[in-house]
Design a protein with these regions (language model features):
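Canonical tetratricopeptide repeat
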Residues: 51, 55, 62, 89, ...
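N-terminal leader/linker segments that initiate helical-solenoid repeat arrays
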Residues: 14-67, 85-88, 310, 314-316
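Residue at a conserved register position within TPR or TPR-like alpha-solenoid repeats
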Residues: 26, 60, 94, 101, ...
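TPR alpha-solenoid repeat register
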Residues: 52, 86, 129, 166-168, ...
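Structural motif corresponding to the intra-repeat A-B loop/turn of tetratricopeptide repeats
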Residues: 29, 63, 97, 140, ...
């Protein structure tokens, strides 16, 4: 169920141009506490404004205040039982609450399934809720209703709505069911059909999980050829360093990453230095490895993994 987390949070932000549209900037800047205060005050004066109430639930969700979010979405479901998004969000926060308290999780499962299935019934085009159902039924144990057959049913519904989502969902199902060849087939179909970075990333992670680093690197190179993202240079270097393969290519890509680095790339340069240190450690080039690990530690001194790598280098 952990894989559902982003489905609960990503769809939260649905803004409207009203007297409280200033909340949009608070969400964009991740100032969820301020958004909560703003919306609470607004709702005190406008208690029947369902959009404001929904946004308050979203603010609670982003802050992982699951109990408060549950209360808000339950109120919305009671106010409008035919709103698919309300059911979807209610099921989502119940799921997150269940993840935090495994002892009570079984008690939430019935309501979670009902909420997602109700959302799917109300909105035949609701992609997110079908994704949630695919993952829910795969990850639940069979004795509480888990079912690959049901998961595949919703994957097929996804494919009818969006071939890419359907292929990714089927790839996920087969990967979870430990059928990597079928998972690879569907991830490749998703790449052919859509070719987004997400599609490539799913296949890359599958190859890594199957201990196929050379295939992973080849796939990342294909993604970079199409999307031309500097972050993909880091990914190539990471795989090369972790699996001790294609070290020259990995080193070259990491230097490109560092040279062209910007905050948008996501991974701090310190991690690229760490990967370079790993590569030089594989080669047993102690001086070069120390040079790069010291650069990594200087930039991010609190990372324990960097310090562990330095101990390994000093032992060369």
């Amino acid at each position: 169920m952990k894989k559902i987390i982003f489905l609960f949070l990503c769809p939260f932000l649905v803004f409207c141009q009203t007297s409280f549209d200033g909340v949009e900037s608070l969400f964009e800047n991740k100032q969820y506490g301020k958004a909560e205060v703003f919306l609470s005050e607004f709702i005190n004066k406008n208690p029947d404004n369902l959009k404001a109430i929904e946004l308050l639930g979203d603010a609670y969700g982003h802050q992982k205040k699951w109990d408060k979010a549950i209360d808000v979405y339950e109120l919305l479901v009671k106010a409008d039982d035919n709103n698919a998004n309300y059911h979807y969000k209610y099921g989502g926060v119940l799921g997150m609450k269940a993840l935090e308290n495994k002892l009570k999780a079984i008690g939430f499962i019935g309501d979670i399934k009902y909420s997602f299935e109700k959302a799917a019934e109300l909105d035949k085009n609701h992609i997110d809720t079908r994704w949630a159902l695919v993952e829910l039924y795969m990850e639940l144990p069979s004795f509480v209703g888990g079912s690959m057959k049901k998961s595949m049913k919703y994957a097929q519904e996804l494919e009818n709505l969006s071939k890419v989502d359907g292929y990714l969902a089927k790839g996920y199902i087969y990967e979870y069911d430990d059928e990597p060849e079928l998972a690879e087939k569907y991830y490749k179909m998703a790449i052919t059909e859509g070719g987004s970075l997400t599609c490539y990333d799913k296949l890359t992670k599958l190859y890594e999980s199957e201990n196929k680093p050379k295939e992973a690197i080849k796939n990342i190179e294909s993604a970079n050829k199409k999307h031309q993202r500097n972050a993909l240079h880091y990914q190539i270097g990471k795989v090369a360093a972790e699996y001790n393969v294609e070290l020259h290519k990995g080193e070259k890509c990491l230097h490109i990453y560092i040279k062209n680095y910007s905050a948008e790339d996501g991974v701090p340069k310190a991690w690229a230095y760490y990967r370079l240190a790993q590569i030089q450690t594989h080669r047993k080039y102690k001086a070069q490895a120390l040079k790069y690990i010291n650069l990594a530690i200087t930039e991010l001194p609190s990372i324990k993994l960097f310090k562990k790598q330095k101990v390994e280098i000093l032992a060369l």
